[in-house]
From Swiss-Prot:
It is a multi-pass membrane protein. GO terms for cellular component: plasma membrane. This is MFS-type transporter cnsL. Belongs to the major facilitator superfamily. Allantoate permease family. It comes from Penicillium expansum. GO terms for molecular function: transmembrane transporter activity. It is found in: Cell membrane. InterPro entries: MFS (IPR011701), MFS_trans_sf (IPR036259). Keywords: Cell membrane, Glycoprotein, Membrane, Transmembrane, Transmembrane helix, Transport. MFS-type transporter; part of the gene cluster that mediates the biosynthesis of communesins, a prominent class of indole alkaloids with great potential as pharmaceuticals. With the MFS transporter cnsO, is most likely responsible for cummunesins secretion and thereby may contribute to intrinsic resistance. Its main location: membrane. The keyword Transmembrane helix applies. The chain crosses the membrane at residues 73-93, 108-128, 131-151, 170-190, 199-219, 304-324, 333-353, 361-381, 392-412, 426-446. Glycans are attached at residue 100.
Length: 482
């Protein structure tokens, strides 16, 4: 075999992937027991040129997939951020005065969007398994109901664990504050009959509606239904994913996987970490411009000074994700250590006097590196969950953690503490410490699980379980990212 050929048994390209058990299940009529990818393995395995493809062929295929998926997902996630940060941009243009909002009412406006997610997350998660992913995704772009959960599911369908951190850092970006700051700055020169804050919401709403239509026609539901891929390319995509033991998709809802997800200690540790990391996000998203204007800057200056946090979050997220992508053994340690940076920023904001404008701004900007550990943590649980129903359950549960943190965040910023917002700063410090402990504990649990499995596993075990829609606990060949 040529040196530039890879097989489905090569490392690190895949491990043994025969899918014999899954193919036998299909032939026996037990389709509900397998991942939908097993069907294409069964249909096309005999048509392939052996089980080989070149490194260059794989590289070109990934590049094509990137160009089809990443830009669309990037725009969707950015618009989701614009939708949530628009309230902060509107705050510098008298939305509180025009609507006669008290400090508490403004805080609840920042929390309110996430209550919808909490109420409808269960039904929406069930729908995500039962209906095609992309029409459902497009609908949620229109409603912004569970976009992040949908994005996470799409990424996990297409990419291997070592490829996910880089894509997550680009897709789940924080460019929204940059765009919102620029839009707010431009709107600041508007002299028309409408209030300036209304113009901001009109622009964001119009972009959202257009994007939902584009998503419906551009994104494929899954690799098997991707019209831009040939049968051979679909086969390669599926075989690349096979070694991860995480599957692609199954339309059968399995209640036993729901219970496994709920009673898994790892679920709760990640839940705590996500909720803790999102408390600062909820507060800063709603009060960012008020914090800056409280330092003595006018509306136009505040709009411009609100742009760097987006760059800090995005660049730190990309940098940390690229570092995390180099290993599957130390990702939780990398995430934990990275939380020290936003923790330092929070301490600066708390300790420095308000008269130290430069120090306060530096502390605020450093605070925004909190997005890096969060987006990297997403790639950790993406890689560590198998079984389609379990994935859906956990993604829904983690969205609830995300929403809970974002609901609590604005409530820690009290109007009677303005412009210092001491309660909000102290809450961020506490949450960062809690997140560090939860992520460390998660890494330890995963490490101990891997050690226990290594004592019993045989090489053939993983191959026998390909595409059987098993969970990470059921498949003893599954190895957790730590």
């Amino acid at each position: 075999m040529a040196a530039d050929q890879v097989t489905i048994s090569d490392e690190p390209k895949g491990g043994g992937v025969t899918a014999d058990a899954a193919v036998k299940a299909i032939k026996a009529g037990r389709n509900k027991d397998v991942d939908i990818a097993a069907q294409i393995v069964s249909d096309y395995a005999d048509q392939m040129d052996g089980d080989t493809w070149s490194v260059e062929e794989e590289r070109k295929l990934i590049r094509r997939i990137d160009w089809r998926l990443i830009p669309t997902l990037f725009v969707c996630a950015t618009l989701s951020g614009l939708d949530k940060t628009a309230i902060s941009a509107a705050a510098v243009y008298n939305i509180k005065t025009d609507l006669n909002l008290t400090g508490a009412e403004y805080s609840w406006i920042g929390s309110a969007p996430f209550f919808g997610g909490l109420l409808f997350m269960g039904p929406l998660a069930y729908c995500l398994q039962r209906v095609p992913a992309v029409p459902f995704f497009a609908f949620n772009v229109l409603c912004w109901g569970i976009l992040e959960m949908s994005v996470t599911m799409v990424v996990s369908m297409w990419y291997r664990p070592e490829e996910q951190p880089k894509r997550n850092s680009i897709i789940l970006n924080v460019v929204a504050p940059i765009i919102n700051g620029f839009v707010a700055w431009v709107v600041g020169y508007y002299k028309g009959p409408y209030e300036r804050w209304k113009i901001i919401f009109l622009l964001v709403g119009a972009l959202t509606i257009v994007t939902s239509v584009v998503v419906y026609f551009v994104l494929p539901n899954n690799p098997l239904e991707a019209k831009f891929l040939t049968p051979r390319e679909k086969y390669i995509v599926i075989q690349r994913k096979a070694a991860d033991n995480t599957g692609i998709e199954s339309k059968t809802f399995k209640m036993e996987q729901v219970w496994e997800a709920i009673f898994d200690i790892k679920t709760w540790l990640i839940w705590i970490a996500i909720a803790a990391l999102q408390v600062p996000n909820g507060g800063l998203t709603t009060f960012n411009t008020l914090i800056i204007s409280g330092l003595g800057f006018d509306s136009l200056q505040t709009s411009l000074l609100a742009m760097p946090p987006g760059a800090m979050s995005t660049l730190s997220g990309i940098g940390l994700s690229y570092l995390a992508a180099t290993t599957r053994r130390y990702r939780t340690a990398i995430v934990t250590v990275s939380i020290l940076l936003p923790l330092f920023g929070a301490v600066l904001c708390y300790a420095l006097p308000r008269t130290n404008l430069a120090g306060q701004l530096v502390g605020l900007y450093i605070l925004y590196t909190y997005w890096a550990p969060y987006v990297t943590l997403v790639s950790v649980y993406q890689a560590n969950v198998a079984g389609h129903t379990k994935k859906i359950t956990l993604y829904a549960w983690f969205y609830i953690a995300w929403a809970t943190g974002n609901i609590i965040g604005p409530q820690t910023f009290r109007a009677d503490q303005a412009p210092e917002y001491t309660g909000g700063t102290v809450a961020m410090i506490i949450c960062y410490v809690v997140a560090m402990f939860a992520i460390t504990a998660y890494g330890v649990v995963c490490h101990l699980s891997n050690k226990k499995r290594a004592e019993a596993i045989e090489a053939r075990t993983a191959a026998d379980h390909d595409w059987l829609d098993m969970t990470d606990k059921e498949n003893v060949g599954f190895k957790y990212t730590t």
